UniProtKB/Swiss-Prot annotation:
Residues 515-702 form the Rab-GAP TBC domain. Keywords: GTPase activation, Repeat. The gene is Tbc1d9. This is TBC1 domain family member 9. PANTHER family: PROTEIN VASCULAR ASSOCIATED DEATH 1, CHLOROPLASTIC, TBC1 DOMAIN FAMILY MEMBER 9. Residues 425-441 have a biased composition (Low complexity).
Length: 1264
């Protein structure tokens, strides 16, 4: 390609000149190409090794063209190429278009200017024609991308993130090379002294990623997969490399978990022209994502908030009259601050609250100050800002966007929910739109919303307000303490501010740890969790969800209904319909908001507590914060998040209570207790009034406090747990301890915990104060940091998700192993290959949406599905019949056959059923599969139109022929009705019964798998018409095209084809014969025409295949130029017996009235062979045997333009005819080694794209 001219001082160093003229030189890199001239040898090896180690661009473009004037010592690179052909084209263009022109110039400087301008003009014109946009990647990185795609055969869709120099340890020998990190793969390439080694590992196959340090190798990264371990060392910046590897592995695990693909963020601001371009645009994107994730976690912001930038500054804090050093963070909707000293002060200022941003006057005490005022009359003063003008401009831009969004939201929502006070003051009305309650009113704690003209009942008061059970005389001391807590919080608000913009300090945490007053609990939960931000930015969202979900039912709503009455049944608020209805609405609304989660057990317990202290909409947004931000992946079908934190808890227990760890591991208690403790935040194992204090701390500190509390519980029971003999005893000890945790400050009447009611305590357990327990947890385990937990979570997430994937694989294999002929090992390999193809299509694209192909709610066997494009690739590599140009057509037919439900996707069970029949089925099963693939109608067929192939035969065989209405096609399924994909077989007794076909279809949908399997016997298979028979012949000829016994198989196929043509012709005679019975009487039913069923004594038959040209040429199938019929016209059948002019020689299909009308008789079809010793004797023929005879003349396959609509054959005839040819029998009986095919499929790359990779693989051996 043409490149911008660059100066080269040493033109011949490490390069060999191949062609030259007065102005241009074509050179080749030493070590590339072995056609003499010093290309090989030791010098070439050294140069090649040097290029790899130094990452030279000559590794990508080993050819180049230089420009030089005769009297100058400076050379200019003007073109380069990866192949000799590419660079030769550029050379010839220069000779034809520039060489003559340059001789006209007299000044060498003019020549140089002209050449440089010409080359730059060519590049600009190319970019304009091809619409090449400005790329932020450096030229060096672009070369690395080209090298990456060429070295590892990756498609263009595979994006390189970064590459690093390192050493890979193969045994005890390090191989110096380059590690390439792409979105989906970790790759390594090394070229030393002529030996090249490559390694490719998919991120989804990694089970462990560790940064280790040993005495010999202080910095080393260990990458583990299911089958091997890999070690990399000698990094220039190991921390940066490892962080990027962690991030890419996390993206891969997210893809396994919920099928989320990676999409590059195109909205990142471009770098300034003056800033150096050191990293790729994709690396910048990933770095920005990591920073945004930390930013959101630190300040509890919504999931879609993106960090724009951060800067060091100071904040003036009026409560202690100090300037606190810290960092300011600016994003699209928020300005946040956190101090350098942990927990000293933090601040969150939503831009929706900001009224004024102005630059204050600078002074020696306050250099570069910035003042920000909010609606609640708070002013924040920042100083020591490095680039204040730029910062003010960015904040102003974001403020304009925020203001426009606020106005548009107001216009959308109107006045129906402009403020809570307005809504509360509205008169109540009867509401009858709820499916659970017909009426409700404000007096009962519910209010009507007028959204789009519909009324949606939503509770306006907390359930605790309506169902408070306390007696002032009985609880006076506790009420006094509660009052003091409220006053302490009010004083705190007056000093530090109230609402989202308040200063959050160590004092705030102290008040939370002492317990939040009941009257303030809902407000502070919203504030501390960040749910108040989502509620404020989504007005009317919850009411819309409630309205949308009303009256709709699915699996989630069924599970919700089942668990409603199990949610705090001991509390009076959930002993009546009002509390139950509010809980139902919140859970159902969230299930519709997040269908990936829907509903998970334990959500009902947590939500019921939220409803006690927060209004209904507030409880919904608290649930959103809990499920999507604070406890990620906890509440899904596989509770992955809880399992990850269970692993983290085990590690923490090993570090902090080592004396107990081994004992707990032996008893298996940690895994049992952690799920129930973490999923419900101790609400299900601790008395209610104590558990809500844990929830208070959780909303302030996050998951950190749950780990601390769990460790404190174990630490308090060390001695008793060490004396336990089994897990039941240990669980009893912990259960009794948690039941004894009390809250002496609670103003609620004691609510007996359900666990304590059911347990048989031998005696009272000493009471444990919840505040003392929490204090102890901070004293002993307060050093646990949130960033440490995140690191441990990553390590456990890899292990947990891969363990779940292995469990899923075992469950699938165990379920399906009895249905197929594959071994367990073969099924496991096939499943890994099938899933890998599904995942590959997710990130490299496919013809269907990846989310449609993966549904975690389905059974394991149906979770991963592939479309036709993916199936076609696997068909070519795994199926024994894939051969030649006909493979795509055959794959399409098999895909239609396997796609039983007609959704254009097949799951693993369907895939394996077809593969098992084709590879390990007996001869009859294989031929039945081949027959069924061709009896399917064409994709363009219309469902309501009768199949033309059987139109005539069905009329006369209504009493015995099953009717097949299975019409499927890749292109036409979208237009078909809901009955698509069901095979409907109805044994017709009368033509008038066609009207009942719909009832039959509905009935057959209810058939069990056993009944379906019975209906697919050979007798029930539809007949093959002439067009389908032609396609079957084409398939068979293509199947044999690469077989060693190709000629023998062609001869055998020709004989079988001729035989079946004759059978079809005679079958047509006996089909049309009954229609003429009135005019021409036929023979009695029980009699056969003499000489037709049995040959005359002494007569013999033989089929002789003659051809005027070699059989290979005459029988070759070329669908583009000729039809199959024209190619088979030279197939002749000769009969040595006298010809009977009165009847057509054929196979007799005896439709005796004495046979059962509902089934077809089985016939053994026999044919005399071409050898004398194969003659049949009368005593060898059974009662139901039909002898095949042929007529004189030629039997040819008709052309498609003149198909005979009455011609048809059955599967029994096809099977029996093929059995007459030993060559065909041997071919279909030939065993197939599936493991060998799977192994080759792992490494084969098709069209520059790896089909699949079930695990890590080496492209070339690293042992060299």
């Amino acid at each position: 390609m043409w490149v911008n001219p660059e100066e080269v001082l040493l033109a011949n160093a490490l390069w060999i000149t191949e062609r030259a003229n007065p102005y241009f030189i074509l050179q080749r890199r030493k070590g590339h190409g072995g056609d003499g001239g010093g290309g090989g040898g030791l010098a070439g090896l050294l140069v090649g090794t040097l290029d790899v180690v130094l990452d030279s661009s000559a590794r990508v473009a080993p050819y180049r063209i230089l420009y030089q004037t005769p009297d100058s010592l400076v050379y200019w690179t003007i073109a380069c190429g990866g192949s000799r052909k590419e660079v030769t084209e550029h050379w010839e263009w220069l000779e034809q278009n520039l060489l003559q022109t340059l001789s006209i110039f007299e000044n060498e400087n003019d020549v140089t200017t002209f050449v440089r301008g010409k080359i730059q003009g060519i590049i600009a014109e190319y970019n304009k024609i091809n619409d090449v946009k400005e790329d932020e990647d450096t030229e060096k990185f672009k070369e690395a991308i080209v090298k990456f795609h060429r070295l590892f055969g990756m498609p263009e869709e595979e994006k390189l993130v970064n590459y690093y120099s390192c050493s890979y340890w193969k045994g005890r020998v390090p191989r110096q090379g380059w590690m390439y990190l792409s979105i989906n793969h970790l790759c390594f390439s090394s070229f030393l002294m002529g030996r090249e080694a490559k390694l490719v590992i998919r991120w989804v196959d990694i089970t462990q990623l560790e940064k280790n340090a040993t005495l010999l190798l202080p910095d080393m990264i260990k990458v583990s997969t299911r089958s091997s371990e890999h070690f990399f060392s000698v990094f220039l910046n190991i921390n940066e490399t490892f962080k990027l590897m962690e991030q890419l592995a996390n993206i891969a695990m997210r893809q396994l978990l919920d099928n989320e693909g990676f999409e590059q963020d195109r909205s990142l601001p471009k770098l300034k022209k003056k800033s150096p371009k050191k990293v790729s645009a994709l690396k910048r994107d990933l770095d920005a994502r990591a920073k945004s994730e930390r930013y959101r976690a630190l300040f509890r912001l919504p999931k879609d908030e993106k960090l724009d930038g951060h800067t060091d500054c100071t904040l003036w804090t009026p409560f202690n009259k100090m300037h606190i050093l810290g960092q300011m963070f600016v994003s699209t909707n928020y300005i946040c601050f956190t101090s350098k000293e942990e927990n000293l002060c933090s601040l969150i200022i939503p831009l929706r609250e900001v009224t004024i941003v102005e630059k204050a006057d600078s002074c020696s005490v306050l250099p570069s100050p910035l003042s920000i005022s909010t609606r609640n009359r708070m002013t924040f003063l920042f100083a020591n800002l490095k680039d204040r003008d730029f910062l003010v401009q960015r904040i102003s831009d974001f403020l304009q966007q925020t203001t426009s969004r606020i106005y548009s939201d107001k216009e959308f929502s109107g006045s129906c929910n402009s403020s809570d006070d307005e809504v509360y003051s509205r008169p109540s009305s009867l509401v009858s739109s709820s499916p659970q309650r017909s009426t409700s009113s404000d007096a009962d704690g519910e209010r009507p919303f007028n959204l789009n003209g519909n009324s949606v009942p939503t509770a306006t008061q907390t359930l605790m307000t309506m169902y408070r059970r306390r007696s002032p005389e009985e609880f006076n001391p506790k009420l006094a303490k509660e009052f003091l807590k409220e006053q302490a919080w009010k004083i705190h608000f007056a000093e530090y501010g109230q609402g989202i913009c308040m200063y959050r300090t160590e004092k705030t945490r102290e008040l939370v740890l002492k317990g939040i007053p009941e009257s303030m609990r809902g407000e502070l939960w919203l504030l501390l969790s960040g749910a108040i931000n989502e509620k404020a930015t989504h007005p009317g969202y919850y009411e819309g969800l409630v309205e949308k979900s009303m009256g709709k039912y699915n699996l989630a709503t069924e599970e919700i209904e089942r668990d409603l009455h199990r949610s705090l049944p001991e509390h009076p608020a959930f002993q009546n319909e009002m509390g139950i209805a509010a809980l139902r609405r919140v859970l159902t609304a969230y299930a519709f908001r997040n269908p990936n989660i829907g509903y998970c057990q334990a959500m009902n317990i947590v939500t019921s507590v939220l409803l006690l202290y927060a209004k209904e909409e507030e409880a919904f947004w608290l649930l959103v914060a809990l499920c999507e931000r604070m406890l990620p992946d906890y509440y899904n079908t596989r509770v992955v998040g809880a399992l990850v934190d269970q692993g983290v808890f085990e590690e923490l227990a090993r570090d902090y209570v080592p004396q107990l760890y081994d004992c707990m591991q032996d008893l298996g208690v940690i895994s049992t207790i952690s799920l129930s403790w973490f999923l419900t935040l101790f609400l299900s194992v601790m008395p209610f009034e104590s558990a809500v204090v844990v929830v208070d701390c959780f909303f302030y500190e996050g998951i950190k406090v749950i780990f601390q509390l769990a460790l404190a519980v174990l630490d308090a029971n060390v001695d008793k747990l060490l004396n336990c003999k089994d897990d039941g005893e240990a669980m009893t000890v912990l259960g009794r301890y948690l039941d004894s945790v009390t809250n002496k400050d609670s103003t609620l009447p004691p609510i007996p915990h359900l666990h304590s009611l059911l347990s048989d305590d031998v005696g009272p357990y000493p009471a444990v104060d919840i505040f003392r327990l929490i204090g102890t947890s901070y004293e002993k385990f307060g050093t646990i940091r949130a960033d440490l937990i995140e690191q441990m979570r990553f390590k456990q997430r890899l292990k947990v998700i891969q363990t779940l994937e292995d469990t899923t694989k075992r469950n699938v294999v165990r379920t399906i192993v009895t249905e197929t002929s594959f071994t367990i090992d073969e099924l496991e390999e096939l499943y890994a290959l099938f899933k890998a193809e599904h995942l590959t299509s997710c990130y490299w694209g496919g013809s269907s949406n990846a989310l449609d192909r993966h549904d975690p709610s389905l059974p394991y066997l149906e979770q991963y599905r592939i479309d036709f494009e993916q199936f076609k690739g696997m068909f070519v590599l795994l199926f024994p019949w894939a051969c030649g140009t006909h493979s795509d057509v055959l794959a399409s037919r098999l895909f239609q056959l396997l796609d039983e439900n007609g959704d254009s996707l097949i799951n693993f069970r369907e895939f394996v059923s077809g593969l098992s029949a084709a590879c390990h089925g007996d001869l009859t099963e294989k031929l039945k599969l081949l027959y069924k693939m061709h009896v399917l109608p064409e994709p363009s067929c219309d469902q309501d139109e009768p199949d033309s192939a059987f139109e005539a035969t069905q009329y006369f065989f209504e009493d015995i022929t099953p009717e097949c209405t299975h019409v499927v096609g890749l292109d036409s399924r979208g237009k078909q009705s809901a009955d698509d994909g069901f095979v409907t077989v109805s044994l017709k007794q009368d033509r008038g019964k066609r009207a009942n076909s719909q009832e039959n279809r509905n009935y057959l949908k209810l058939w069990t798998a056993e009944n379906k399997s019975k209906s697919k016997t050979a007798k029930d298979l539809p007949k093959l018409n002439q067009g389908q028979f032609i396609e079957l012949c084409k398939t068979m000829y293509n199947m044999f095209s690469e077989d060693p016994n190709e000629q023998e198989l062609y001869h055998a196929t020709a004989a079988v084809t001729s035989l079946l043509l004759e059978i079809g012709e005679v079958g047509k005679f006996f089909i049309t014969q009954p229609a003429k019975e009135d005019a021409v009487p036929g023979p009695p039913c029980g009699q056969a025409i003499p000489g037709m069923l049995f040959p005359k004594k002494g007569s013999s038959q033989s089929y002789v295949v003659e051809s005027t040209e070699p059989l290979t040429a005459s029988l070759a199938v070329d669908s583009e130029e000729h039809s199959l019929g024209g190619q088979m016209e030279d197939i002749k059948l000769e009969d040595s017996s006298p010809r009977d002019n009165g009847a057509c020689s054929s196979m007799l299909i005896s439709d005796d009235d004495t046979k059962d009308d509902s089934s077809m008789s089985s016939y053994s079809v026999l044919s005399a062979g071409s050898h004398e010793e194969d003659k049949l004797h009368c005593e060898d023929i059974g009662e139901d045997t039909v002898l095949v005879r042929s007529s004189q003349g030629r039997a040819t396959l008709p052309r498609s333009s003149s198909l005979d609509r009455d011609w048809a054959i059955t599967f029994e005839q096809f099977l029996a005819s093929l059995l007459t040819e030993p060559a065909l029998v041997r071919y279909f009986d030939k065993p197939v080694c599936m493991m060998a095919r799977v192994t080759s499929a792992k490494n084969i790359r098709m069209m520059g794209k790896p089909l699949t990779s079930a695990s890590d693989y080496e492209i070339s051996a690293l042992s060299g």
